[in-house]
Amino acid sequence: MTPEDLIAHYELEPIPREGGRFRQTWAGPDRGDGRPEGTAIVALLTTEPGDYSALHRLPGDEIWHYHLGDPLRMLLLAPDGSSRVVVLGPDVLAGQHVQYVVPAGTWMGARVLGGGSGGGSGGDGSGGGGGWTLFGCTMAPGFTFEGYEHGDAAELAPLYPDRAVEIGELGRA
């Protein structure tokens, strides 16, 4: 299984500004305020240069789900000035998460860990390794592009000086 196979199978399209590819797989009924009751997407990031989830935040909680491939390293910058790194992946006994809730208003960005064909737990179609991560995100109320706020690395780095290098790596103009 390759990223190209997954792109074709799921009919993934580029995610505007943020990076990666996605397809919305579900949207609930409209709530009357322009937002659906909930949304779900399947998404793909790779280790290709420039392919990462750029820093952004959303007005509601977002649940990230690990599906296949290499672990995904998420940088989270909380409104109170704290920060943390969470790794989505299959090795839950080593502290990885198959599901993680990012609280509303938290800046988030993500990059695939591992790399290249044969990396991780296998490049044999088993879903491990190969320089990519297939994951999903779920929100309720649902995602809208109007609620997406793109992060500015130059503004965020002074607020989280211990994460300045990582912020620079996950910024995108």
Task: List the predicted regions and their residue ranges.
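Extracellular beta-helix/beta-solenoid repeat scaffolds
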Residues: 104-106
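Non-catalytic, conserved peripheral segments adjacent to functional cores
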Residues: 1-100, 109-110, 115-118, 128-130, ...
